[in-house]
Amino acid sequence: SLLQGGSAYLPGRPEIQWKNLNPMQLMEELGQFTSVDGFKEMLDKADVGQAYMERPCLDPMDPQCPESAPNKQKRRVPNIAQELAGGCYGFSKRFMHWQEELILGGTVRDSQDRLLSAEALQTMFLLMSSRQLYEHFRDNYEIHDINWTEEKAAAILETWQRKFVELAQQSAPENSSQIIHAFSTTTLNDIMKSFSDVSVIRVAGGYLLMLAYACVTMLRWDCTKSQGAVGLAGVLLVALSVASGLGLCSLLGIS
């Protein structure tokens, strides 16, 4: 929850974040001023409870570890393998369950199939789409003078992903045995774009090498046994088929 930015403000309360948000307590306080029965019913159906406030802290000595954490009073570091066995739950225990296979890799188990350790841990951040981000801030007064568009929202998301990947890769200490691999949609698009870029020099050089190979292997001094023209025609046919394929993709708008 420390990595999930997001914050909200309420008069008379400290800044509300995932690491200090207790939905049940918040509903009780808001219930003194307005009816929140609908919200309570929704939270009950989703089995939210106290959200992350009732989950164990990685460091129970951390001052920000809530008193409601199960290992806060005992000051005991949690058994990570035991906590992650069978997967883990998100904000809603009913609708947000991450299976063990999705978050752990290289697992080691005992003879009774109990999880002992894992070599890899995967975490995921779900971002808004560019359309959702645009709609979310469209009526916000703070951006009324920047000509807010969906294209700008997409640019912000792309910049955020690039910065996140950069910071994630730099977060591991130099002498650490841990390796961090950060991947995002922007990274995938960059990879696809790099493979889609066509170098005219490389393509021409490749076909010249193919032409030379075909001529050398199929050309004979005896004209009756020479098939150099066949090799030349084959290379030209391949070149024309690739060119026609690229032209068709360009015509269809596929890049």
Curated annotation (Swiss-Prot):
InterPro entries: SSD
Subcellular location: Membrane
PROSITE patterns in the cross-refs: SSD (PS50156)
Cytoplasmic side: 219-227
Any single GO BP term: negative regulation of smoothened signaling pathway
Membrane-spanning segments: 198-218, 228-248
One MF annotation (Gene Ontology) recorded for this entry: hedgehog receptor activity
Residues annotated as domain SSD: 199-255
Gene: PTC2
Induction field: Activated by hedgehog.
Organism this protein belongs to: Cynops pyrrhogaster (Japanese fire-bellied newt)
Annotated protein name in UniProt: Protein patched homolog 2
Keywords associated with the record: Glycoprotein, Membrane, Receptor, Transmembrane, Transmembrane helix
GO cellular component: plasma membrane
Physiological role: May act as a receptor for sonic hedgehog (SHH).
Signal sequence, renumbered to the chain: none
Bilayer topology annotation: Multi-pass membrane protein
Positions bearing carbohydrate: 147, 175
Segments on the Extracellular face: 1-197, 249-255
